[in-house]
Amino acid sequence: MDVEGREHCLINQDLYHLGSRGIEYDLLPWMNGNGVPLMAYCPLAQAGRLRQGLVEDEAVRQVAAHHGITPLQVLLAFALHDEHVIAIPRSSSVRHILANWESRTIELTSDDLALLDDAFPLPTHKVPLDME
């Protein structure tokens, strides 16, 4: 896909987190292939009910236990595991900011990612962008 003026696009901001992976079908691969980084907003799924489902998910908890981190740090590490993704998590305290900062050094293993993929599968077809 050719996009006129794409050389002027320095970054694209989209909703992206473990429970909202629609952009991984075609948008994120196109962006990666064209040198357009993703700025992921809501990487911690700060949308109440959805966030609760993610942090309580057994796969997320297993990965957290494996690394000795919190489920929220797993969510942020997932968003950051692609080198072309930056994240803008909302933080309401110094403690949250520090936990988020530590997440940048967490390296999820291929087993971790496979476990998360099983629990939250990649899209198999184009889906509308989520609007949480």
Predicted segment positions?
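Beta/alpha (TIM)-barrel catalytic core signal, keyed to glycine-rich beta->alpha loops juxtaposed to Asp/Glu
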Residues: 1-132
